[in-house]
Design a protein with these regions (language model features):
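Structural marker of alpha-solenoid helical repeat scaffolds
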Residues: 281, 315, 349, 383, ...
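Catalytic Zn2+-binding segment of zinc metalloproteases
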Residues: 114, 124-141
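Canonical positions in the second alpha-helix
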Residues: 278, 311-312, 345-346, 379-380, ...
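Extracytoplasmic and endomembrane cell-envelope/extracellular-matrix remodeling and assembly machinery
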Residues: 27-28, 40, 52-54, 60, ...
Length: 456
């Protein structure tokens, strides 16, 4: 009887939290349009003050993960964007209006893709449920932007954890109810998207143990996401009661590849030396051979990279994206036929992979086959519409085809996705000049200019 009553109690709590997630924020809260503007202004300032990871494999991995979870959410209120900041601290934060930021240190600390997805799902709930609007003590959007500025500090050392900084951080600390709502809805979205809901519990347990062992050096993530053993217990109970299933084993986790890319960005030669020593100890290991090949590619040693990646592919063809890596290396070794074959192999398995389409577009450009390059970059835009580089590449490809109208148009969209609205408007105006005044295409462009100006 107790189990039945407990199950009903947990289900009731979850139902209330779910209903609350789409309930109205306080009357004094900023509007949704104001939240979107705040998100855009915050991104502009973040680009000035923080270092972003601008690597297609890292960016598109995180973006793809976020899009996959958003499909499970369904009711999307905001134009969501996902970013990775080059920062060794373990942190992630959401900004009202749809922007989610992950520190590279967090990616390095998670053990699986599912754990990282659990963090993203949690942050999506905070945004979609308008928790920031509830935290704000007034309708003054400028004040909220000022409080969010605490996230722009590149390093939050002991001196920063005092006085005004800690006061501002506390203003962004989510309540117990908000955290439970983000936990319970988040694991539901996680499972619906095909990720392991238990990963959220695993990640929280590890954070909790670390906090107990080192209460002074707690992760920045916990400053705004208070963690208690009761919160973990409640999440475990929710997973059991909702009957959320763990997915079947999916092979080698792509997170290891992404973590290696991030590591190579910091100190490539030191990482390559470590990878070389690791392979010397296990010369028959396909993964050790593959990792060293990636290291050589990152440092421009293309022939060595090719030889190792080919060896790894022969030994273990199931390594995720090994054909994509080979295709990219073949471009640099001028073996274009092999590059095409490698890309075709991976696209048969993963036709919607934007990174492969990006590299294939680069291959077509090397061959001066610009129409085919355009088709590849259009695929990148299709599968990663909010990634600026896809639009930029498309604009340059159209320029090589002597189609300046389309070139300026897509370059404008790349600026817009980087929140450079002035440059976007200028490029759209240049694009409009290449179409007749009464043409439908020009009208679309002029409407876009008007919409950008109206958005501020």
């Amino acid at each position: 009887m107790w189990i039945t009553l407990h199950r009903l109690a947990v289900l009731s709590v979850i139902a209330c939290l779910a209903a609350a997630s789409f309930g109205p924020p306080p009357a004094h809260a900023v509007s949704q349009q104001e939240e979107i503007r705040i998100s855009r202004e915050f991104r502009k300032e973040a680009r000035r003050r923080l270092k972003f990871v601008e690597d297609p494999e890292v960016e598109l991995y995180v973006d793809g993960m976020g899009r996959r979870i958003l499909e499970a959410v369904g009711n999307i209120r905001y134009p969501y964007r996902f970013f990775v900041i080059q920062d060794d601290s373990m942190n992630a934060f959401a900004v009202p209006g749809g922007s989610i930021f992950l520190h590279s240190g967090l990616i390095q600390r998670v053990e699986t893709s599912d754990e990282l997805a659990s963090v993203i799902a949690h942050e999506i709930v905070h945004i979609n449920a308008r928790h920031f609007a509830s935290l704000s003590s007034s309708s003054d959007a400028t004040m909220l932007v000022g409080v969010l500025g605490v996230f722009l500090a590149p390093v939050l050392g002991p001196a920063a954890l005092a006085g005004p900084a800690v006061a501002m951080t506390r203003q962004l600390e989510f309540s117990r109810q908000m955290e439970e709502q983000a936990d319970n809805l988040g694991v539901g979205y996680l499972a619906r998207a095909g990720y392991d809901p238990q990963a959220a519990v695993d990640f929280m347990n590890r954070l909790y143990r670390e906090r107990i062992l080192n209460p002074v050096g707690r992760p920045r993530y916990l400053l705004t996401h208070p963690l208690t053993d009761k919160r973990i217990d409640n999440l475990e109970a929710s997973i059991r009661v909702l009957g959320l299933k763990r997915p079947r084993f999916r092979g080698v986790d792509e997170i290891q590849r992404v973590k290696l890319v991030i590591e190579l960005r910091k100190d490539p030669e030191a990482v390559v030396e470590r990878l070389r020593k690791a392979r010397d100890k296990r010369p028959q290991s396909a993964m050790a051979t593959y990792s060293l090949g990636i290291g050589y590619a990152a440092t421009g040693r293309w022939i060595r990279a090719r030889d190792l990646l080919e060896r790894a592919a022969r030994s273990e063809p199931a390594i995720p994206n090994v054909d994509r890596d080979l295709g990219r290396v073949y471009i640099h070794t001028q073996e274009f036929a092999k590059a095409h074959a490698a890309f075709e192999r991976i696209l048969k398995r993963k036709p919607d992979d934007p990174v492969t389409h990006l590299y294939r577009g680069q291959l077509f450009e090397k061959e001066s086959r610009f129409r085919q390059a355009v088709r590849s970059y259009l695929r990148v835009r299709q599968f990663a519409p909010s990634w600026p580089e896809g639009a930029r590449r498309l604009g340059h490809a159209y320029r090589k085809l002597n189609q300046p109208g389309k070139a300026h148009y897509y370059l404008a969209h790349s600026y817009l996705l980087r929140d450079e609205t002035g440059k976007a408007i200028d490029s759209l105006a240049r694009a409009a000049e290449h179409y007749e005044p009464d043409s439908p295409r020009r009208q679309v462009i002029e409407d876009e200019i008007a919409a950008i100006r109206a958005g501020g």
